[in-house]
Amino acid sequence: MPIQVVSADFDKTATRPEEWPRGATPEIAFVGRSNVGKSSMLNALARRKGLARVSSTPGRTRALQFFDLSYRPTPAARPRAIRFCDLPGYGYAKVSRAERDRWTAMIEDYLRDRDVLRAVVLIVDARHAPSESDEDAAAFLVSAGRRLVVAATKTDKLPKARRVLALQQVERALGLARGDAVPFSAVEGTGTDALWARLAALAAEEARTAEADPPA
C-alpha cells in the first residue's frame, strides 16, 4: 500500500554543522551528480511540486537543504516524522577548485558525523553506466558505515526493453545484488512507492533498534 504523505515543508539551509537541524527525527540524505534529478525525486516523494527547486543549471544547490515530512505507512497508522537532506551535486566542473573542495568537505563531514542519518540515497542516471564519481561516492558511503539505497532515475528516457539491462549494469558497477537498484522516473511516477517503502522501513528499523538497545 502506498505511503501517505501528510505534510512536506522546507526546513532550512545549512553549510556548517552548527546549522544542522536539532532533534532525533530520522534523516535520509540524497546525493548524486549535478542535474541527475535529485530535486525532481524529492518533489515526487513529497507528493508536492515545487518543494525542492528544480533547475536546468547544474551546480545550483551549494548547501545542505533540509525538508521536514510526516507520513503514514498505513492509512490507520499515526503520522511519523522524517527529514530529507538534499546534498550539493558532485561532478560539476564550472566552479573553482577551492569551491569544489569546500563542497566536498561539507558533504563528507555531514555523511560521517550526522548521528540521525539513517540512510543515503545515491541517485544515478539509468541511461549511462555509473561514473567514477558515482563509484567513489558509493565506496565512501560504505566505508562511512552508511546504509546505501541506489535509485536509477530517468528510466522514462529508456525504451522499456532496455530498462532491465540498464539496472543490471548499475548493480554490477556498484557491487549490488540483482534487484537492489530502484528504477525511478519522476515523469512516469514509477519507483516512488518502492523507494518510499525502503526508506520508511530503514527509518523504522533504526528506531526499533534504538528502543531495544538504548545507550548506556
UniProtKB/Swiss-Prot annotation:
Identify the keywords attached in UniProt to this record, alphabetized: Cell cycle, Cell division, GTP-binding, Magnesium, Metal-binding, Nucleotide-binding, Septation
Domain of life per record: Bacteria
The protein's matches in InterPro entries, at most eight in alphabetical order, are given as: G_ENGB_dom, GTP-bd, GTP-bd_ribosome_bio_YsxC, P-loop_NTPase
Signal peptide positions (record): none
Q: Name one GO biological process term.
A: division septum assembly
Q: Which PROSITE patterns does this one have? A: G_ENGB
List cofactor names only. Answer: Mg(2+)
Domain EngB-type G: where?
Answer: 24-205
GO terms for CC?
Answer: cytosol
Gene Ontology molecular function, alphabetical: GTP binding; metal ion binding
**Binding locations of GTP:** 32-39, 59-63, 86-89, 153-156, 184-186
Residues binding Mg(2+): S39, T61
Homology family: Belongs to the TRAFAC class TrmE-Era-EngA-EngB-Septin-like GTPase superfamily. EngB GTPase family.
According to its UniProt entry, what is the function of this protein?
A: Necessary for normal cell division and for the maintenance of normal septation.
Q: Which NCBIfam families match?
A: GTPase_YsxC
Record-given protein name: Probable GTP-binding protein EngB
